[in-house]
Every structure is written in structure tokens, then in C-alpha cells.
């Protein structure tokens, strides 16, 4: 029962991601921008047909689709197995839940639409950050949390601890 309760985290992340994408697409189309905080934050819809930051866009669509599908399924099985394991620490489970929910959101986008919807657009002075989405945010925060967990308890993750001097 406790493991089922933990499924609420990735499910919630998935709902936030898909809901936010549906919301922004209800009033903006690809290439359109709505300024929220002038000179700092925009809603700017872009369709990422490549991998992270638009990489691998040069590959033919069929190869990209197969590659992303296999990589996504492998990651879901790997992280899902750790997430549901009885001995996974709660801190690690939070990070993994964020990663899983975000990966599912972007994966479903790619599976059903052939691209990932990105729309969060930040500008810092002359620096314009990549456009991203809610799923990307949760994946990043989840990876940081999971990484902290691995550093704090390397043997629990299956990683080999450094020898003591």
C-alpha cells in the first residue's frame, strides 16, 4: 500500500506537466510568445523534435522515434524498478518520482505528437535560456535530489563506495 501511495508523486508531476502544456496550447501556437514579466519571463511555445536542447534533430524521424522510444522505456524500467524497491530511501524516492513523472510527460508528448512542447522562456540580461517545460524542471530537480542521495549513501544505490584511506 505504501508503494502505491508513492505513485502519487510521479502521477502528480505527470498531471502538472500535461495540464500546463494543454493550458498554454489553448491560447498560443508554435512560435507565438506571450510576455509575462517583460525582459525576464515569457510563455513562448516551441516544439522540440530532437533530444535535449534540440540535439539529434539531424537524424531521420523514424530513427529518432525508435531511439527515443527505446531509451525512454529503458529509463522507465530502470528508474521504476529502483523507485518501487522496498529498500529505496524516501529522499531518493522523491527524486526518482520527479524524474519518472517528468520523463512520462515528455515521453507521452513525443509518442503522441512527435515532439515535446516547451514554453517556459527565461531571459537574464543578454542571456536567453533554453525554452523548457514543467517536466524538464521536475527531471532536473529530481536528478539533483537523487544525486545527493547517491552521494550520501552510495552503497544503498549499488554504487561502489570509494576506499577509505
Predicted regions located by residue number:
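Alpha-helical transmembrane bundles and membrane-interface segments of multipass inner-membrane proteins
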Residues: 1-165
Amino acid at each position: 500500500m505504501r508503494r502505491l501511495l508513492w505513485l502519487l508523486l510521479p502521477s502528480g508531476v505527470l498531471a502538472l506537466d500535461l495540464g500546463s502544456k494543454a493550458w498554454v496550447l489553448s491560447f498560443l501556437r508554435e512560435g507565438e510568445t506571450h510576455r509575462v514579466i517583460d525582459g525576464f519571463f515569457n510563455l513562448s511555445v516551441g516544439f522540440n523534435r530532437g533530444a535535449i536542447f534540440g540535439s539529434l534533430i539531424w537524424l531521420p524521424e523514424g530513427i529518432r522515434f525508435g531511439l527515443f522510444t527505446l531509451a525512454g522505456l529503458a529509463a522507465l524500467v530502470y528508474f521504476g524498478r529502483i523507485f518501487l524497491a522496498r529498500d529505496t530511501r524516501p529522499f531518493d524516492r522523491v527524486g526518482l518520482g520527479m524524474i519518472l513523472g517528468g520523463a512520462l510527460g515528455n515521453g507521452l508528448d513525443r509518442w503522441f505528437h512527435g515532439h515535446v512542447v516547451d514554453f517556459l522562456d527565461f531571459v537574464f540580461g543578454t542571456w536567453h535560456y533554453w525554452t523548457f517545460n514543467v517536466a524538464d524542471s521536475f527531471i532536473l530537480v529530481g536528478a539533483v535530489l537523487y544525486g545527493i542521495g547517491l552521494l550520501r549513501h552510495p552503497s544503498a544505490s549499488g554504487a561502489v563506495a570509494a576506499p577509505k584511506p
